[in-house]
Design a protein with these regions (language model features):
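Basic, amphipathic juxtamembrane/active-site segments
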Residues: 72-114
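Hydrophobic alpha-helical transmembrane segments
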Residues: 1-62, 100-213
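Active-site His/Glu-centered metal-binding helix of metallohydrolases
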Residues: 66-74, 87-95, 124-127, 131, ...
Length: 213
């Protein structure tokens, strides 16, 4: 999935709300998104003993993602877009990733080693994109695991896990191997996240090589 490349198509859901919040400090909206991301991670961590929290956590992830997109739209419409705001947004995004993915990683839904690999994949994906910009190459959103993709997957898989528990199929069984549905999401983050990081690294290297020719 490459939902980050489709960001412009979400304007219909952002612009009307952004216009109503045009007098609100965009940084305040960023803080709300970060707090919601922390809450979602906490809900996922606690959800093994209360599976309904999976649904609540999924909803909170979606709302957090909405606020994450809304702050930039408000800043743009209000003429308050700045490098400081962009920097704060990137920092908060990384903390949000850690909160949301970390909540699953340390929960009983996930093998801790898999959780660690998923976090590495997610953080390296974002790092390789911003590091490209830091060295003077174009900022990269390329790959199969952008921020928007993570938000959508972190909304869908908790719902799948909840439905699986209710129907009596909490795991995907392959022979003697049983994997929670939430772990499938984490496997995707671990594998595709690191592949996306490598892909972005290769693209940046090629871009920098062209500049040096």
């Amino acid at each position: 999935m490459v939902l980050d490349s489709q960001r412009g198509k979400a304007d219909f859901a952002l612009t009307p709300v952004a216009k109503k919040l045009i007098n609100v400090n965009p940084n305040m909206i960023s803080w709300i998104g970060l707090i919601l991301a922390f809450l979602s991670g906490l809900l996922f961590y606690l959800s093994y003993d209360g599976t309904y929290l999976l649904l609540v956590g999924a909803a909170v992830v979606l709302i957090s993602g909405y606020f994450d997109a809304l702050d930039g739209k408000v800043a743009k419409l209000a003429g308050k877009a700045s490098r400081k705001g962009d920097y704060l947004d990137h920092v908060f995004d990384r903390y949000a990733d850690i909160f949301m993915i970390g909540g699953v990683a340390i929960s009983s839904w996930c093998n801790p080693y898999l959780g660690m690999l998923a976090l590495v994949g997610v953080l390296l994906t974002s790092y390789m994109g911003t590091q490209a910009q830091a060295v003077g190459a174009p900022r990269l959103y390329a790959g199969l695991l952008g921020r928007a993709d993570r938000v959508i997957l972190s909304t869908i898989f908790p719902i799948i896990q909840y439905v699986g528990v209710v129907l009596g199929y909490p795991t995907l069984d392959i022979g003697d191997l049983s994997i929670y549905w939430m772990e499938i999401m984490m496997i995707w983050f671990a594998v595709v996240g690191n592949l996306t990081a490598i892909q972005r690294g290769i693209i940046t290297w090629k871009n920098l090589s062209k500049e040096s020719e």
